[in-house]
């Protein structure tokens, strides 16, 4: 899988599938099943390390897990998250992004919009592929007042649209849209020539991502609205992954019950 193929998917209308992975074993299963993208996510702070948020994930953590996933996945496009405070300025961002690329990432992802213009541009100038992340931004959960849907009011929605257009103009290859109204995600997706990957953003994004642990029902307590357990009706993990891929490709997931 490569960036050109993702762009072709957008043009043809075929949906892009994405799951998180943190180790070689899960990555190899997802890869064999034909997942399009594997995100080595800083969500490992929640599901691997047991934290309440992603803020304590370090660059060393991300490099370690990127190396592990790379050993298991050779076909899917590998995207690695840049963790909290790893891109506070453009030079720091470039240094840390290069560490993830050396570890095996083919693209790096970081949260935020126009406030990171310098980092987006320095990546573009250094030919480092970038995935953006707009809407709910887990690394800013404290500043944003908790985990909640973004883009419900006009000011917030306008900012998401403005940021998305700016990111595309600065060479960003893909944008994740998290927890925004489905109609806003549709508007953003239709306004861009690059693919969007939704999580809690409705069926009209160009692709869908879930945290793999959520997709497999490995959670206790609160479960976000956008999550579906694909293992519960499947016999094993491979079958669950195949069911997720099929549901995304045929647009039966996410349904209205998973959208805002």
From Swiss-Prot:
Gene3D superfamilies (UniProt xref): Phosphoenolpyruvate-binding domains
Location(s), subcellular: Cytoplasm
Gene Ontology cellular component terms for the protein in this record: cytoplasm
Catalytic activity: 3-methyl-2-oxobutanoate + (6R)-5,10-methylene-5,6,7,8-tetrahydrofolate + H2O = 2-dehydropantoate + (6S)-5,6,7,8-tetrahydrofolate
Pfam annotation, one family: Pantoate_transf
Main location: cytoplasm
InterPro entries from the UniProt entry: Pantoate_hydroxy_MeTrfase (IPR003700), Pyrv/PenolPyrv_kinase-like_dom (IPR015813), Pyrv_kinase-like_dom_sf (IPR040442)
Binding site for 3-methyl-2-oxobutanoate: 42-43, 81, 109
One of the protein's GO biological processes: pantothenate biosynthetic process
Subunit structure, interactors included: Homodecamer; pentamer of dimers.
HAMAP family according to UniProt: PanB
Descriptive protein name: 3-methyl-2-oxobutanoate hydroxymethyltransferase
UniProt organism field: Ruthia magnifica subsp. Calyptogena magnifica
């Amino acid at each position: 899988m490569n960036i050109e193929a993702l762009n072709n998917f957008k043009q043809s209308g075929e949906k892009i599938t994405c799951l998180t992975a943190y180790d070689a074993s899960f990555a190899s299963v997802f890869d064999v099943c034909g997942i399009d993208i594997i995100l080595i996510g800083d969500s490992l702070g929640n599901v691997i390390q047991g934290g309440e948020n992603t803020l304590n994930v370090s660059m060393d953590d991300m490099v370690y897990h990127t190396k592990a996933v790379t050993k298991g996945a050779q076909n899917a496009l590998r995207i690695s998250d840049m963790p909290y405070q790893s891109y506070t300025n453009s030079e720091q961002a470039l240094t840390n992004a290069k560490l993830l690329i050396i570890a095996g990432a083919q693209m790096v992802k970081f949260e935020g919009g126009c406030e990171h213009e310098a980092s987006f541009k320095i990546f573009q100038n250094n030919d480092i592929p970038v995935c953006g992340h707009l809407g709910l931004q887990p690394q800013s959960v404290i500043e944003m007042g908790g985990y909640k849907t973004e883009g419900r009011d006009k000011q917030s929605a306008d900012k998401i649209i403005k940021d998305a257009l700016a990111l595309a103009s600065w060479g960003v290859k893909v944008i994740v849209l998290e927890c925004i109204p489905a109609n806003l995600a549709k508007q953003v997706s239709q306004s861009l020539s690059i693919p969007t990957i939704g999580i809690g953003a409705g069926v009209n994004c160009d692709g869908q991502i879930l945290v793999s642990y959520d997709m497999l029902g490995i959670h206790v307590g609160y479960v976000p609205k956008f999550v579906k357990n694909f293992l519960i009706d499947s016999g094993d993990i491979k079958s669950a992954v195949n069911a997720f891929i099929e549901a995304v490709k045929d647009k039966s997931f996410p349904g209205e019950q998973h959208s805002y």
